[in-house]
Amino acid sequence: MTVLVALFCLVTWTLCTRIPQYSTQGTQQPQQPEKTPHPHPQPEDAFPPTHATDLKIHDPSIIHVDGTYYSYSVGRHIRIHQAPSLDGPWERTGAVLNADSVIPKGDRKAPWAPQTVHHNDTYYCFYAVSNSGCRDSAIGVATSKSPGPGGWTDHGLLVQSGTGKGSDEHPFTSSNTIDPSVFVGEDGHGYLMFGSFWSGIWQVPLDESLLSVAGDTSSEARQLVYMEKAPLPASKHPNPLCREPSGARPIEGSFLSYHEPWYYLWFSYGKCCKFDTKNLPPPGREYSIRVGRSKSPRGPFVDKQGRDLANGGGEIVYASNRDVYAPGGQGVLTEKSGDILYYHYCRYPVIQEIEVDADLTVNKSTSYDFWV
């Protein structure tokens, strides 16, 4: 089945330097980076090339409303940027929250990995609070009648793991409640996907308000992505909420989309950040974008070899190539022209272990079939 996917690429904040300074005027193209041998070379036609704009961002969520594009990303109180087109010019216009998250755990000032959806004349921004490397985490939600800054109400806790109410119930006893993603079908049923490392990616149904889990989570939860054999060693952290006794499984950042007649579950696999060019992970261990599909939003999702994503499957859609290193943190924006897969990546060469701004890129003319 042919799927039209335009690549809307966001160079991640994490660990990327030698990033050219881009003009913020109109849609002027960026300077080309220095030609440097890639640590994991790919054939030139292995993946579509990228195209940069002026947006500096990390972990984006993109929606399109009445001719304006809105981007939501990690940052103080969840940053909002707006633009008249995906090319830009992008302008930071404010934040979702007008104060720290009301959830009393994790990084309340700068919630992680937000995702914004529109349903029943309301905008919902789902976000996570946590501390890096630990699963004492929570997912919250804010709502507004408009997508821009101002007018948002923080409803607080939706689900949590590690500590707090409900964290002693399955699947929160073994999962990490970050990287929220919500899908609402044409029938109005909503589903929350979440998870990072530990027991992989899970899904629970939401009630009609999208503000609470529907039914009993123990019986309704579905494990969507997992691998039995952990590819990374176990942590020796003294806090049991910050170690994985059976080893680490680098699975996170899920996103569910629909392209008739299939539901596609996208996720990121591998090391996302804190790279050292003198000691890069083995080829294939850095971030890449993977996918599976199902005839049901509840799964099971399989790759084109028929492997269940809950048993180690996952079709690689985009990986390191050219000056792209460790792409991930993806989402899908459905436009009249087709489905736009957007994500962030590190621009190679990656040369130091600090966080810096990075840049939005877009390719709106790439058509490829990742399932054949």
From Swiss-Prot:
Localisation per UniProt entry: Secreted
Pathway annotation: Glycan metabolism; L-arabinan degradation
Region ranges (Disordered): 23-52
Entry-linked InterPro entries: GH43_arabinanases (IPR050727), Glyco_hydro_43 (IPR006710), Glyco_hydro_43_endo_a_Ara-ase (IPR016840), Glyco_hydro_beta-prop_sf (IPR023296)
Sugar attachment sites: N120, N363
Pfam families xrefs: Glyco_hydro_43
Keyword Secreted belongs to the record: yes
Keywords: Carbohydrate metabolism, Glycoprotein, Glycosidase, Hydrolase, Polysaccharide degradation, Secreted, Signal, Xylan degradation
GO cellular component: extracellular region
Enzyme Commission number(s): 3.2.1.99
Keyword check for Signal: yes
Bias kind Low complexity: ranges: 23-34
Family statement drawn from the similarity comment of this UniProt entry: Belongs to the glycosyl hydrolase 43 family.
Name the record gives this protein: Probable arabinan endo-1,5-alpha-L-arabinosidase B
Protein source organism: Aspergillus fumigatus (strain CBS 144.89 / FGSC A1163 / CEA10) (Neosartorya fumigata)
Source species taxonomy: Eukaryota, Fungi, Dikarya, Ascomycota, Pezizomycotina
